[in-house]
């Protein structure tokens, strides 16, 4: 059998197989796995829980955390008290329910609410520049304490736990604390690297575009000015502590009102209002106004009809009516209808100046009489409108109705 150089010998027991025989008989889906979480602290030994150096936490922050826990407990007590009162209203006996506990006391206020380096409350977190001639500025004096990696990790872990408790979280898993500690560790590394580059650049060039290298690094990482730390201390730490004190006081008072409602009613005294004598103010009434009230306008207020001089201006001449005048009756706008035929009553045929009564011919009259060419003429072939038999009514005396009638007469 001819063999080539480098040819792999085929065992005698193995038969020739095609490429299709090498394919798998059943196709299986490949399982997708998430990429593993990058946690820098996973490959390093876990530091012990006890700190190598004593920590000095801020008393203001610790007291704020205690107030948050106290407020959480007060809210649970208030919810329990409200549930019991609701059950009593529904018919559950008071003996079956457990007695409400007394209001727990607020955590004591620490004596030193400010850190050791921040005793002045008027200027908290004040920035002080070191004296260039001092030993600290020259790097002389006591040696600086160097922290090991385990000590830094422990302090950072405790700081992250304090921040979460100050924010309002009651509990957290250890894996969450480890992950957030790694995030804070990476942020600190980035900050210190930028600070190292800025210091070297300032030493090389002899100047920096910012007032200080620390100010430059603060802008590069996105914090802003160095004064933003002072604003954060004032608003997020001090003002938040004052707000928690107010909330604790309000919740304590609310729980006391629920537990002791009788005491709450005794404490609330009624507000006394000093009574002063009130004198009646009299307004003089003119003689002309009394004369108008004596006329037929007494049925409506003065503000509706107006005075006699306001209803009939001096420059408007009222046409004389051949019939008996009755201005007091027909002057009311409530009885004046523009296109309604007015007929006298049967008992007052002689005096047609009284109020007209609607007759049946008003509704039986065809609409062809109301053409657009003009209005129908009055029965006595006068030029006045067909609205009323009395020309001294409001329709004849009012300038509004007079102008409209004369305008239509010009069209005719």
UniProtKB/Swiss-Prot annotation:
GO terms for biological process: maintenance of protein location in nucleus; positive regulation of DNA-templated transcription; regulation of DNA repair; regulation of RNA splicing. Keywords: Isopeptide bond, Nucleus, Phosphoprotein, Transcription, Transcription regulation, Ubl conjugation. Its main location: nucleus. The keyword Transcription applies. It comes from the Eukaryota. Sumoylated. There is a cross-link at residue 269 (Glycyl lysine isopeptide (Lys-Gly) (interchain with G-Cter in SUMO2)). The modification Phosphoserine is found at residues 106, 321, 332. GO terms for cellular component: nucleoplasm; SAGA complex. The keyword Chaperone does not apply. GO terms for molecular function: protein heterodimerization activity; transcription coactivator activity. Pfam families: Bromo_TP. It is found in: Nucleus. InterPro entries: BTP (IPR006565), Histone-fold (IPR009072), SUPT7L (IPR039460). Residues 384-393 have a biased composition (Low complexity). Residues 81-107, 364-412 are annotated as: Disordered. PANTHER family: STAGA COMPLEX 65 SUBUNIT GAMMA. Component of the STAGA transcription coactivator-HAT complex, at least composed of SUPT3H, SUPT7L, GCN5L2, TAF5L, TAF6L, TADA3L, TAD1L, TAF10, TAF12 and TAF9. This is STAGA complex 65 subunit gamma. It comes from Mus musculus.
């Amino acid at each position: 059998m001819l063999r080539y150089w480098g040819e792999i010998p085929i065992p005698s027991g193995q038969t020739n197989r095609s490429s299709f025989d090498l394919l798998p008989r059943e196709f299986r889906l490949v399982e997708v796995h998430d990429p593993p979480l990058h946690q820098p602290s996973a490959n390093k030994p876990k530091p012990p829980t006890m700190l190598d150096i004593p920590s000095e936490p801020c008393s203001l922050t610790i007291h704020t955390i205690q107030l948050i826990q106290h407020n959480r407990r007060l809210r649970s007590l208030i919810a329990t008290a409200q549930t019991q009162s609701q059950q009593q209203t529904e018919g559950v006996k008071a003996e079956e329910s457990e007695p409400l506990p007394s209001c727990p006391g607020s955590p004591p206020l620490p004596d030193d609410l400010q850190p050791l380096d921040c005793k002045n409350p008027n200027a908290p977190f004040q920035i002080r520049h070191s004296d260039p001639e001092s030993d600290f500025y020259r790097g002389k004096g006591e040696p600086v304490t160097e922290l090991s990696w385990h000590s830094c990790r422990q302090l950072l872990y405790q700081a992250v736990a304090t921040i979460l408790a100050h924010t309002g979280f009651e509990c957290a898993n250890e894996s969450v604390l480890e992950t957030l500690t790694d995030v804070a560790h990476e942020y600190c590394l980035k900050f210190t690297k930028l600070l190292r580059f800025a210091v070297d650049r300032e030493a090389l060039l002899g100047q920096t575009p910012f007032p200080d290298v620390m100010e430059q690094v603060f802008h590069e990482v996105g914090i802003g000015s160095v004064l933003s730390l002072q604003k954060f201390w004032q608003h997020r730490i001090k003002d938040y502590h004052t707000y928690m004190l107010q909330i604790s006081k309000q919740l304590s008072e609310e729980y006391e009102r629920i537990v002791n409602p009788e005491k709450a009613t005794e404490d609330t005294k009624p507000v006394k209002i000093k009574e002063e004598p009130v004198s009646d103010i009299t307004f003089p009434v003119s003689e002309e106004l009394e004369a108008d009230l004596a006329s037929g306008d007494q049925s409506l207020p003065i503000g509706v009809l107006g005075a006699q001089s306001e209803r009939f201006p001096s420059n408007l001449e009222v046409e004389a009516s051949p019939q008996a005048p009755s201005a007091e009756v027909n002057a009311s706008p409530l009885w004046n209808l523009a296109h309604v035929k007015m007929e006298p009553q049967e008992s007052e045929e002689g005096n047609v100046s009284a109020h007209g009564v609607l007759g049946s011919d008003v509704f039986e009259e065809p609409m062809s009489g109301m053409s657009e060419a003009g209005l129908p003429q009055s029965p006595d072939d006068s030029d006045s409108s067909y609205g009323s038999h009395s020309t001294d009514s409001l329709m004849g005396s009012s300038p509004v109705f007079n102008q409209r009638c004369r305008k239509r007469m010009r069209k005719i």
